[in-house]
Amino acid sequence: MSPATPVPPDSILESPFEEMALVRGGWLWRQSSILRRWKRNWFALWLDGTLGYYHDETAQDEEDRVVIHFNVRDIKVGQECQDVQPPEGRSRDGLLTVNLREGSRLHLCAETRDDAIAWKTALMEANSTPAPAGATVPPRSRRVCPKVRCTTLSWNPCKVERRIWVRVYSPYQDYYEVVPPNAHEATYVRSYYGPPYAGPGVTHVIVREDPCYSSGAPLAMGMLAGAATGAALGSLMWSPCWF
């Protein structure tokens, strides 16, 4: 007895999807939750109790996936969907409203009423039937999501270096000499040609200041000294009144 010839999978189902994992698939209209616009998507109900919708029947580009298993409160069909309008040119008989336990709703529209009833039956079975062991379902990582690369740059103010170009002309020696601005700064002298002075033989000075050095302390000391001086002068002005 010759072995049975394997049945080729449905042409719609492509690798890595397996026919055994798909419960029901077909085209449905879906209403967006924000703009309330209708869009036609390919829907696939998988054995793990999830409902995914895609750009086309190849099920390669997944827009999103909704958990159906133990998450459906009720499903309305046709004229029962009073709070939603069908897509332009479609009949109200094909409407489906899936009320989820988490509070959200999924508004769909099938081609015919019979198709809508078939989808309702499949969704209700997926809601109450546990997924069989070994069922192969496409991973959710195949969703179509914007690829955003986040780059984090660490910044430390103590690592910032500010360069100041300083030159002082000495009339006695007839050349430019370097004078350090403050004692807490380190001065490095380098002789080369370049900006900001392009004259020949100009000596440039690069001053590396400590950006963590706070100028608030000298300012506070100056204000304190000024206040003490003012108080002393005030007491001297009123001193003749004591005699």
From Swiss-Prot:
GO terms for cellular component: cytoplasm; membrane; photoreceptor outer segment. Residues 21-128 form the PH domain. Pfam families: PH. It is found in: Membrane; Cytoplasm. Keywords: Cytoplasm, Developmental protein, Membrane. CDD domains: PH_evt. Disruption phenotype: Mice appear normal at birth with no obvious behavioral or growth abnormalities nor overt sensory deficits. At 6 months and 1 year of age, mice display normal retinal histology and normal response in electroretinograms. The keyword Isomerase does not apply. Gene3D superfamilies: Pleckstrin-homology domain (PH domain)/Phosphotyrosine-binding domain (PTB). Highly expressed in retina and brain. In retina, abundantly expressed in photoreceptors. Isoform 4 is the predominant isoform expressed in mature olfactory receptor neurons and vestibular and cochlear hair cells. Also expressed in cells with possible sensory function, including peripheral retinal ganglion cells, cochlear interdental cells, and neurons of the circumventricular organ (at protein level). SMART domains: PH. One of its GO terms (molecular function) is protein homodimerization activity. Binds transducins. Homodimer. Interacts (via PH domain) with MYO1C. Interacts (via PH domain) with MYO7A. This is Pleckstrin homology domain-containing family B member 1.
